[in-house]
Amino acid sequence: MILATTKIEDFDRFWNAFSTKGAEKRRQHGSKGAHVFRDPNEDDRVWVVFDWDEEGWQNFISDPEVPAIFQEGGLQGTPKAAEFVRPHDA
């Protein structure tokens, strides 16, 4: 799992790119799905939980075609992944 966050210009613009070109590119890098959340305190921030491994995430972020998709989606910078600390059973 990968938890990532970024700021966006407009949610509809973000969603249009995320759910089309972004989804296709993520799939190419092994993503199995995502859950998108809007931040309750910052209207211009989204959080996404990806069903993805670290290698796939890094390959996606370094793909030379991805910045254009981010720009189309109105992202304000490259998404940042939270550091995974450890799992817990409850």
Predicted features by range, described:
Residues 29-46, 69-90:
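Glycine-rich beta-strand-turn "strand-cap" elements at beta-sheet edges
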Residues 1-8, 34-63:
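Short, well-ordered beta-strand segments in beta-rich or mixed alpha/beta enzyme
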Residues 16-19, 23, 42, 55-57, ...:
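Short linear sequence elements within intrinsically disordered, low-complexity coil regions
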Residues 11-33, 64-70:
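Short amphipathic alpha-helical segments
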